[in-house]
Swiss-Prot record:
Organism, scientific name: Listeria monocytogenes serovar 1/2a (strain ATCC BAA-679 / EGD-e)
Membrane-crossing residue ranges in chain numbering: 15-35, 55-75, 82-102, 108-128
Membrane topology annotation: Multi-pass membrane protein
Covalent S-S links between cysteines: none
Keyword Nucleotide-binding: no
Keywords: Cell membrane, Membrane, Transmembrane, Transmembrane helix
GO annotation, cellular component aspect: plasma membrane
Record's subcellular location: Cell membrane
Family (UniProt): Belongs to the PsiE family.
Main location: membrane
Full protein name: Protein PsiE homolog
Length: 137
């Protein structure tokens, strides 16, 4: 019986270590993509080719912010003692929907529905930031 208790106490620790190592690898990968995206934006600003439109540059900037938000989420996970704050997922959702609207705004109905989704996420963010639901220090 004691052996089973010892195994059941070791398994969560091993899983947490595995999760943390995987998140560290994902974080470094995202940093590499963030640097690549920053380099692309820098090249587009200072060495703007006439074939590159501002539409694609805006898309690159929003992709940069998505990478940035995911990196911030991973950093916050380690700072808040292995807990993902809900509001960071909401920020990522809002940014992703805005990027999608910019990329594909051909249908007015879908743009209106996506705008409503952003409004719902902002309301959820407001609720998540109330003192009753906020668990961060």
């Amino acid at each position: 019986m004691k052996r089973l208790e010892k195994i059941s106490s070791i398994v969560p620790i091993l899983l947490r270590i595995t999760l943390n190592l995987a998140l560290i690898m994902v974080g470094f990968t995202l940093v590499a993509f963030l640097i690549r995206e920053a380099f692309t934006i820098f090249n587009n600003i200072f060495f703007l080719d006439t074939d590159v439109s501002y539409y694609y540059m805006t898309q690159d900037i929003l992709t940069f912010f998505l990478y940035f938000e995911f990196i911030a989420l991973i950093v916050k996970y380690f700072e808040s003692h292995f807990h993902f704050p809900l509001r960071y997922f909401i920020y990522i959702g809002i940014t992703a929907i805005i990027r999608f609207i910019i990329v594909d705004h051909s249908s007015a109905t879908s743009t209106l529905i996506l705008s409503g989704a952003i409004l719902l996420l902002v309301a959820a963010l407001f609720l998540a930031n109330t003192k009753m639901l906020k668990r961060e220090g």
